[in-house]
């Protein structure tokens, strides 16, 4: 592979343009032993070991994932998040001790994303199986997020469990994975019942 091909590959990653990709490749080439070779090996190992958790749709090297397997977590507290990055934002802050359910996006009429394209089917079954007592809707406060929240609320309404949504700290139109830990912690602490 030539250097320009590697630069082009980095440029495909989010937040990386041609200039930053060139700088990264140059840095890697100058630090082959300390950074480039271990990075290449780590990426290759992870590519073969990472798998989607069959329970929550997290990505981990364990199946079920280390969160779903953790007996110290509260399995009766289920936080439904839009994307994997949202789960990681909660975990980074170490502010939540329940379990998660990653949807893989939000319902969107504009983009043609319906319930069949998201991980929605298994929510009710999971609530029943693990005797979930509270569902926390941890979805961004966008228009699509609000539609998805309403859909999930209607799905679990008949189960008679508490359904809450993150409150203060999330601006209208805001995305969860862009929030700092303090804002996310405040939002989690002040969630409110919607069903």
Swiss-Prot record:
Record key words, sorted: DNA damage, DNA recombination, DNA repair, Metal-binding, Zinc, Zinc-finger
GO BP terms in the entry: DNA recombination; DNA repair
Limits of the Toprim domain: 76-171
Zinc finger (C4-type): 53-68
GO molecular function, one term: DNA binding
SUPFAM superfamilies linked to this entry: Recombination protein RecR
Family assignment from sequence similarity: Belongs to the RecR family.
PANTHER family: RECOMBINATION PROTEIN RECR
Purpose of the protein: May play a role in DNA repair. It seems to be involved in an RecBC-independent recombinational process of DNA repair. It may act with RecF and RecO.
Protein name according to UniProt: Recombination protein RecR
Organism encoding this protein: Ehrlichia chaffeensis (strain ATCC CRL-10679 / Arkansas)
């Amino acid at each position: 592979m030539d250097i320009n091909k590697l630069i082009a590959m980095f440029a495909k990653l989010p937040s990386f343009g041609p200039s930053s990709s060139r700088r990264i490749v140059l840095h890697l080439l100058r630090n082959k032993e300390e950074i480039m070779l271990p990075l290449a090996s780590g990426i290759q190992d992870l590519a073969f070991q990472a798998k989607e958790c069959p329970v929550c749709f997290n990505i981990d090297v364990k199946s079920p994932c280390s969160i779903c397997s953790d007996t110290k977590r509260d399995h009766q507290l289920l936080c439904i998040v839009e994307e994997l990055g949202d789960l990681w934002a909660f975990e980074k802050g170490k502010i939540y001790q329940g379990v998660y359910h990653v949807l893989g996006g939000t319902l969107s009429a504009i983009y043609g994303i319906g319930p069949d394209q998201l991980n929605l089917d298994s929510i009710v079954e999971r609530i029943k199986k693990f005797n979930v007592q509270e569902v926390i809707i941890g979805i961004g406060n966008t228009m699509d997020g609000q539609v998805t929240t309403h859909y999930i609320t209607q799905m679990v309404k008949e189960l008679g469990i508490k359904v809450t949504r993150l409150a203060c700290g999330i601006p209208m139109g805001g995305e969860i994975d862009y929030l700092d830990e303090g804002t996310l912690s405040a939002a989690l602490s002040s969630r409110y019942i919607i069903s």
